[in-house]
């Protein structure tokens, strides 16, 4: 099995699970925060939505410059899902054409051109999948705090038993 096939297998589980959680994000709760220092629910949901696109860029070797990233502007759950589906498709399509050698090349995270971090694409992609799962977990807590039933992610939830 190739490196790309391993990642595709992981995304084939994680991306549909993520989408089921995003489906539960209520459009009217976008500005809600559990604490003044926390991100808004809409911001967090949009971050989760954008990460599959970052995954595709990592594999293609397109560095991320945080200063050039578009601002977070939560619109609606429908927009979130449309954006997520498009980005998930790109990630899968890029992985389908990737060669093992692509994953040994480097990728960098920048801010205004200054390199913040550099790593092998294989390592960075794995970390980005972990980052997605981490923020998906945060999002599930935000939803729970708003009494929104949670879907099954790794096993049944109290809402689905």
What are the roles of these predicted feature ranges?
Residues 1-3, 47, 108:
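Short low-complexity stretches enriched in small and charged residues
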């Amino acid at each position: 099995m190739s490196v790309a096939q391993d990642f595709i297998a992981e995304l084939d589980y994680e991306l549909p699970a993520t989408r089921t959680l995003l489906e539960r994000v209520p459009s009217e709760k976008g500005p809600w925060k559990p604490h003044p220092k926390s991100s808004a629910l809409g911001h967090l949901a949009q971050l989760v939505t954008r990460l599959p696109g970052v995954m595709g860029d990592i594999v293609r070797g397109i560095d991320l410059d945080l200063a050039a990233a578009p601002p977070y502007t939560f619109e609606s759950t429908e927009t979130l899902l449309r954006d997520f589906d498009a980005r998930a498709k790109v990630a899968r399509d890029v992985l389908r054409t990737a060669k093992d050698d692509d994953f040994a090349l480097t990728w960098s995270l920048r801010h205004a051109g200054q390199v913040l971090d550099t790593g092998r694409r294989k390592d960075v992609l794995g970390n980005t999948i972990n980052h997605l799962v981490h923020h998906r977990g945060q999002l599930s807590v935000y939803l729970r705090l708003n009494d929104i039933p949670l879907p099954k992610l790794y096993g049944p939830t109290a809402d689905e038993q």
